Every structure is written in structure tokens, then in C-alpha cells.
């Protein structure tokens, strides 16, 4: 009876992980996070005006804040730099000299 290696499931596992990642990426890219305005037939997420014989909708759209917005990559860079600076200062503050007690004992 010859010995056979166990089945290798790495390729199907990689395919499942890549497929799941792509599905999550597409889901996040196609998601609408704008506020809902209007009714079930007329949607004005970016602002605008709609008028017909029975209804009139006027919506100004989402407003920008007065705080200047930085791109997401800038926030990530700022966060990484802040963490590195915090680690650097924490290492400076806890700098201790370690000595081997057994090496520096005097035999008398």
C-alpha cells in the first residue's frame, strides 16, 4: 500500500479568498452613502429641483464642512507618522541600562 500525501487545499482556498475580496471590494465601491431625498420615484442625492403637475421638490444637496478635507491617504500617512513618533518617544522615555548581575559580581 503506497503512501499518498494529503490533499492540497491551498489553491481552492486562495480562489475563495480572492473571490471574497473582490466581492467585498465591488460591494464597497458600488454602495450609495448619500442621504436619501425625494420619494420612491424621484431621487436627488446631489441636489436639484424637480417639478411636475402635482409636486415640486427643491433640494440644495450635501454641504461641505468648513474644515479643509485631506485625502484618505494623507490621513493614513499622518496616523502612521504619529504612531512612529509616539513609539520613538516611548522608547526614549523607557531607556534603561541592562546589566548582567552575574557578570559584575566580585568573587572574594
Swiss-Prot record:
<comment type="similarity">
    <text>Belongs to the Tymovirales TGBp2 protein family.</text>
</comment>
<dbReference type="GO" id="GO:0016020">
    <property type="term" value="C:membrane"/>
</dbReference>
<keyword id="KW-0813">Transport</keyword>
<feature type="topological domain" description="Lumenal">
    <location>
        <begin position="30"/>
        <end position="71"/>
    </location>
</feature>
<keyword id="KW-0812">Transmembrane</keyword>
<keyword id="KW-0472">Membrane</keyword>
<protein>
    <recommendedName>
        <fullName>Movement protein TGB2</fullName>
    </recommendedName>
</protein>
<feature type="topological domain" description="Cytoplasmic">
    <location>
        <begin position="93"/>
        <end position="108"/>
    </location>
</feature>
<dbReference type="GO" id="GO:0044167">
    <property type="term" value="C:host cell endoplasmic reticulum membrane"/>
</dbReference>
<dbReference type="Pfam" id="PF01307">
    <property type="entry name" value="Plant_vir_prot"/>
</dbReference>
<keyword id="KW-0916">Viral movement protein</keyword>
<keyword id="KW-1043">Host membrane</keyword>
<dbReference type="GO" id="GO:0046740">
    <property type="term" value="P:transport of virus in host, cell to cell"/>
</dbReference>
<feature type="transmembrane region" description="Helical">
    <location>
        <begin position="9"/>
        <end position="29"/>
    </location>
</feature>
<feature type="transmembrane region" description="Helical">
    <location>
        <begin position="72"/>
        <end position="92"/>
    </location>
</feature>
<keyword id="KW-1038">Host endoplasmic reticulum</keyword>
<dbReference type="InterPro" id="IPR001896">
    <property type="entry name" value="Plant_vir_prot"/>
</dbReference>
<comment type="function">
    <text>Plays a role in viral cell-to-cell propagation, by facilitating genome transport to neighboring plant cells through plasmosdesmata,.</text>
</comment>
<feature type="topological domain" description="Cytoplasmic">
    <location>
        <begin position="1"/>
        <end position="8"/>
    </location>
</feature>
<keyword id="KW-1133">Transmembrane helix</keyword>
Amino acid at each position: 500500500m503506497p503512501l499518498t500525501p494529503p490533499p492540497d487545499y491551498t489553491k481552492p482556498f486562495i480562489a475563495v479568498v480572492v473571490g471574497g475580496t473582490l466581492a467585498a471590494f465591488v460591494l464597497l465601491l458600488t454602495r450609495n452613502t448619500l442621504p436619501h431625498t425625494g420619494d420612491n420615484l424621484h431621487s436627488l442625492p446631489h441636489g436639484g429641483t424637480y417639478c411636475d403637475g402635482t409636486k415640486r421638490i427643491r433640494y440644495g444637496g450635501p454641504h461641505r464642512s468648513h474644515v479643509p478635507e485631506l485625502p484618505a491617504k494623507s490621513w493614513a500617512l499622518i496616523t502612521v507618522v504619529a504612531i512612529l513618533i509616539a513609539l520613538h518617544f516611548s522608547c526614549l522615555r523607557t531607556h534603561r541600562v541592562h546589566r548582567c548581575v552575574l557578570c559584575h559580581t566580585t568573587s572574594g
